[in-house]
Amino acid sequence: MKREDINMSAQNLTLLTDLYELTMMQGYFETQENQTVVFDVFFRDNPNKGGYSVMAGLDQVIDYIKNLNFSYEDVDYLRGLGLFSEDFLHYLSGFHFSGDIYAIPEGSVIFPREPLLKVVAPIMEAQLVETAILTILNHQCLIATKASRVVYAAQGDGIMEFGLRRAQGPDAGLYGARAAVIGGCVGTSNVLAGEMFDVPIMGTHAHSWIMTFKDEYTAFKEYARLYPDACTLLVDTYDTLKSGVPNAIRVFTEMRDAGIKPKSYGIRLDSGDLAYLSKKARKMLDDAGFQDAVIAASNDLDEFLIHDLKMQGAAISSWGVGTNLITSKDCPSFGGVYKLAAIQNADGEFQPKIKISENIEKITNPGNKTIYRIYDKETGMLRADLICFADETFNTGEDLLLFDPNATWKKTLLPGGTYTMRELLVPIFQHGECKYESPSVKEIAEFCRQEKETLWDETKRLFNPHKVYVDLSQKLYDTKTKLLNEAHH
């Protein structure tokens, strides 16, 4: 089956928008205000007070933009609302996206206030796509970030995404699984996600399997007969240490005596004191000669519980994480926003626009912008991100002064030749045509792993992480200050 045949995002989701996007579109249409504008997608805070986030969802955004068109049924439905003129509905019937989109590639580490995605398009088009872009990026960035935190807590152990049945619907389960693999999960229990995104699928069996048979030993024996190369047995249906683990050892012994060498085998704990039970089970398995048997665990895990279990010396090397990962239960929203940044004038120049707020964190950065990531040349570690105007250039052979835009006295001078720079925003659509070839999910996940290696451990830690600075160029800072001053006079 072709990917596009099963990809839910390849459906026509044109009406996946808020009503006010359409009423504003009609307003622009009627007043003939359809100048080219720049909108930025950004977020203000990392989830869970973390040190970074992970970019995900761009591939679904691409599919959404490619399939933008108002069907006959869409137009007829809108006509029935009694809100829209026939001239405007006629315009919608021939609608297609003709603008440009730039974005940070999926798997990148990202930070608050920097543009993740930039839309440069006639305002009617740019306004329409706001809602869908936000719902896609807000969801997948959130889950990829959560997965990355869980993976970090596991200290190299494998994390399996097990959350489909607790996800907020099929779409969240599917694209949440995709995002989780991008964030570092080794696989998912979600079979359709495996088919759609070519990611590993994995799982064991439920308590119902054991309860169906006359006893636990028989259930284990039959499962091992059916799946000898991937035999992980759930040992807590009746009594973990008195029944489950001994019966698992009995089956593993019979397999060994029969000359069967599984590619992977072990037990799964799904309840009780996981630290205590895993250490006891580990000793029982080791004493029986099964030192290479894996102990997996599940049971409402998250990064904090896994961190705590690791601190207690739990003998667990594989973790199934469901509800708390697929829903990001303790931080259920990402907070991405879509703000106007510039309007093109009659001369083709972009005039910076700024949104002002009493809350300093809600004041936007004006203009048609891009981002440069700055690395230490010797170590390759990330030093800072620099937001600047899209037409600004830099010479890495020259000194670069970085400063905190909210506390300008905090400054860092990078001597010329000691740093490198990489532009983060890449062209995705040009004049309505997709110019970007999305990597596979496996490639994105590997890129994400490499990205996180450029972060200091102090930034990745779960508690009180070190902040990565996102600074403004002097030119952008001066423009922002000028606009703020003008607005208050």
Task: For the regions a language model picked out, list residue spans one by one.
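Ordered alpha/beta subdomains of enzyme catalytic regions
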Residues: M1-D229, R256-D257, K263, K339-H489
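Glycine-rich phosphate/ribose-binding loops and adjacent secondary-structure elements
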Residues: S208-C388
